[in-house]
Every structure is written in C-alpha cells, then in structure tokens.
Amino acid sequence: MGNRSTADADGLLAGRGPAAGASAGASAGLAGQGAAALVGGVLLIGAVLAGNSLVCVSVATERALQTPTNSFIVSLAAADLLLALLVLPLFVYSEVQGGAWLLSPRLCDALMAMDVMLCTASIFNLCAISVDRFVAVAVPLRYNRQGGSRRQLLLIGATWLLSAAVAAPVLCGLNDVRGRDPAVCRLEDRDYVVYSSVCSFFLPCPLMLLLYWATFRGLQRWEVARRAKLHGRAPRRPSGPGPPSPTPPAPRLPQDPCGPDCAPPAPGLPRGPCGPDCAPAAPSLPQDPCGPDCAPPAPGLPPDPCGSNCAPPDAVRAAALPPQTPPQTRRRRRAKITGRERKAMRVLPVVVGAFLLCWTPFFVVHITQALCPACSVPPRLVSAVTWLGYVNSALNPVIYTVFNAEFRNVFRKALRACC
C-alpha cells in the first residue's frame, strides 16, 4: 500500500531506502545497491506490465472469460498496471539515487497519494474477490441469476472510492509541514501512517481471512451434503419387479392381463368385462366431435372454440403439470457451480498465503516505525519489505490466472501467436 511511503522517525525514506544517507550515495556500496535496484526494478515493472496486460487482453478478447467474477480480476489487474506505470518508476529512481529525492516536493506528494491509493485498491480488490466467492458459495443459484452484474459493479466502485478516500489526505496538504526536508520523500504524519495502515491492511486482511474461511467451510458442507445425497438416493427409489422409470406427468398403471385389446378404464366409465381393473379399449369411448386432437379442458382454462367441453391437449398438459426445471438441467447447473467453486477452493490457500507473505512484513515494520519512534529499524529491512509488497502485484496474475485452465489456454494461444 502506499503505506510503503510510511513516515519514518529515524529519517528513513519510507519504503524507499535511507534518506539520511543520501550524502553517501556516491560510495561503492550504495552504487552497487543502486545498480541492483535498477535491474530489479526494471524486471519487476516488466513482469507486472506483461502479466496484468495479458489478463486484461484475455478477458477483453475471449468471450468465455467475460464472466462477472473475472471483472474483479480485471479491476485488480488495472490497479497493478497503474502501480507499475505511475509508482514503480519513481520508486526505482529513488532507490537508484540511494534514497534521496531530487525531484519537486509536489511530485513527491503525488507519488505518495498514488502509492497509497493504488496499493490500497490492489488489496481491496483481493477482498472484493473473497466477498464474491463467499456469495457464490452461500447462495450459488441466486448468485448466477439475480443481480450479479450490479453486485460486481457496486463492489468494484466501492473498492476504488474507498481507496481514493484513504489517499485523499495526502493531496489535501497533509505533507505540507514546517521544516520538511525536500530531499526526503515520505509521509510526514505518523497518525496518518497508522490510519492508512489500519484502513489498508489491518481491517481488510482479517475480513478477507474470515470470508475465505467461511467459503472453505461452506464448500466442505456442500460437498458432504452432495455425497450423502448421492449415496442415499438408491434406497429411496421405489422397489418393484421392473426397473425404475423416470417420474412421468401421471402415474403409470400396471398392464392388464386381459390382452392388447384391454385398456385401463377412463374416469366415469363402467368397468370392463375382463376384470375390475380393465375397460374396453379406445373404440368403446365416445368420439369427441372436435376430433382426435381434443381433450377435456383443464380447470381455470377458457373453453376451446370447438366446444364448451373441449380444450387443446397441449394446454391441458401444460396446466396439469407444475412448472419445474428438468432434473437434468438442475443436475448440470449444480455440477457446474460445484466444479467452479472447487477450483476456487483449491486456489484459496495460494491466494491467502501469497497475500500474507507479501504484505504482513511491510505493514508490521512500518506501523512499528510510526508507533515506536525510538525503535531502530535497519534501512535495508525497510527497503526489503517494501520491495516484497510491490512483488505482490506481479504475483497476482500468476495466482488468479495460471491456476485457471481457461486463462491458461488463452495465454498459450497468445504466446504461440507472439512466437
């Protein structure tokens, strides 16, 4: 988060190397560090731009990837792209200079604001994905058919608005303090460092963990219930001499032993001579004047023009049967939802692990600097945890796309086209 630019009581360039040691920037040690920062920065910027650009292009060109859930991935990729374009070049420049800020203070303030907003947006997008997956598991059918696009747009809009709100104080003159050193680019207000750290990490991180835990538990309960239903389906089927048949609109009556000329009695007709369960076949039934395609009207339907007691047979069948989704369609829909969420469940440990690995050290170090001015934090540690936080922007495309078979196929097509 932009908190990499956190205030440093010991004169450290928050997340950008030792500001107090700018005078020694020409030394051999700092020159070597500057060269390493330049090479590492170029590689990191290239990885972030390539990975996240490929994500955006894949979703824009591949219709199969244009799903509501992937809109969060595009928003996350956009935040990381802006970070690589607007923040990382200036960060690398400062690292190459040994931590000294040789540009204007206004540009420093703009860098701080962009850093805070874009890094906060990146983490908030991760939280939005966790919210979306939790909803997909909690109410899967409703998730697919009710207000999906609107929900995603609201979450993405809230992500960017909240990120801008966290960064707004920097643009409103928070860094304009007396005695400000123009050679140091950092956040000057320790209270703001605590505020931005809490809003950007210490609140959304537990929320994301809680939602992922609830998602994982919900998927486990879903899987247990599905297996129990599959195993318990056979005993509930009716037993009989013949194989079970799919449920028809009307119950099937057993065949009469009288022979092929015997049919089950129609309602209201006398029993046939063959037996109590048999009536003469269709020829003994009175012919309807409207023809063979006429059937008695169903309750609640208007009479057919050909007669007061006649209605089209299709209308009768439609009225007699309650509206139902075919069992095959329901099974396919459940299988599709279950398969998608199984993939999400397999990715969850990778998502949470990478997030915590990249961001926890950074926020622990920088909030410690803000809350404990007397604590001495090595400049190299500050720089290392800052780099680690930025690396998360390069890992996001790997986590959210390489583990997805559809994205993998699109990436292969793109690489083959380029090669």
Curated annotation (Swiss-Prot):
Q: Name one GO biological process term.
A: social behavior
Gene that this polypeptide is encoded by: DRD4
Keywords from the UniProt entry: Biological rhythms, Cell membrane, Disulfide bond, G-protein coupled receptor, Glycoprotein, Lipoprotein, Membrane, Metal-binding, Palmitate, Receptor, Repeat, Sodium, Transducer, Transmembrane, Transmembrane helix, Ubl conjugation
Glycosylation, residue list = N3
Self-association state and partner proteins as the record states = Forms homo- and heterooligomers with DRD2. D4.7 allele exhibits higher affinity for homodimers compared to DRD2 heterodimers, while alleles D42. and 4.4 have similar affinities for both. The interaction with DRD2 may modulate agonist-induced downstream signaling. Interacts with CLIC6. Interacts with GPRASP1. May interact with ADORA2A. Interacts with KLHL12.
Q: Which GO terms describe its cellular component?
A: centrosome; dendrite; glutamatergic synapse; membrane; plasma membrane; postsynapse
Cytoplasmic compartment spans: 51-71, 132-152, 214-346, 404-419
Side of membrane Extracellular, spans: 1-29, 93-110, 174-192, 368-382
Provide the protein name. Answer: D(4) dopamine receptor
> Where, subcellularly, is it found?
Cell membrane
Q: Name one GO molecular function term.
A: G protein-coupled serotonin receptor activity
- Annotated segments matching region Disordered: 230-264, 317-336
The organism's taxonomy opens as: Eukaryota, Metazoa, Chordata, Craniata, Vertebrata
